[in-house]
Amino acid sequence: RQGIGGSDVGAIMGANPYCSITKCYKEKVGDIPPPELNYAMEWGSILEDVVGKKYAEDNNIHYHGGSLVEETPDYPVSKSGVMYEPSTKRNSKNDWAYAHPDFYVENKEKNITGIEIKTVGEGIYNKYWALGDIPPWQYYQIVWYSMVTKINKWVLVGFAPHLRSRTNPMFTHDIEIDVDTQLRVWDRVAYFWDCVQRRVLPEIDEPSGDDIKLLYPESTAEVVPSNSDIDSKCLKLKEVRDKIKPLEEEEEVLKNKIKYYMGNCGI
């Protein structure tokens, strides 16, 4: 709650399917507790070191154990660089903006590349990684890290355990962040943090059902005045429902005909 980190930014940008901007806001102002540690989060954290060591080994990089390193560790001259877990970084002008990347890699030319490691489930792999895409909430996390750390070159390392029996389960995305994207993200996140400080709900373009439940958990059954915009939306909703109903009826008829044909072979 003491600022904005990389894992918050996907929600703030409306790109995180697991956390909306409304939920993130409610967590930041203390209205709801932060998410509890689950098995996916626990094992994702455990596997960071394992995958990090493998990435370093594959790229002739010295892996430095230990966490929250303040200065670049020494490493053997036979290696092309050193990989280590940096301490938490904060923006020099805005202390609320912080980043805790998984690793840095510094090469012999003193150039630093940020490394972020993700354990990838089968669903996310099929939807994004298998197509060469980056999950958008993870991309925004990297964008945020690039702004806070002033490092523009990043490698997103994915590890998909379900692939390990038939192929290399580790794969990478090389990312360089452009200034326009950084500015767009910064403006949105700064606006969100200002809302948190003032305890004013950020503007929501398309509230979800979960957002409504968070904001209005109980119905007071009070009457609220309408307006032309809401009247228009109500008419549109009626039109949509009128179109859906005959399609649902047709769907049911077709399903039953197919099941009837299949007989006992059907489900």
Predicted regions and their residues:
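Accessory terminal regions of nucleic-acid processing enzymes
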Residues: R1-I267
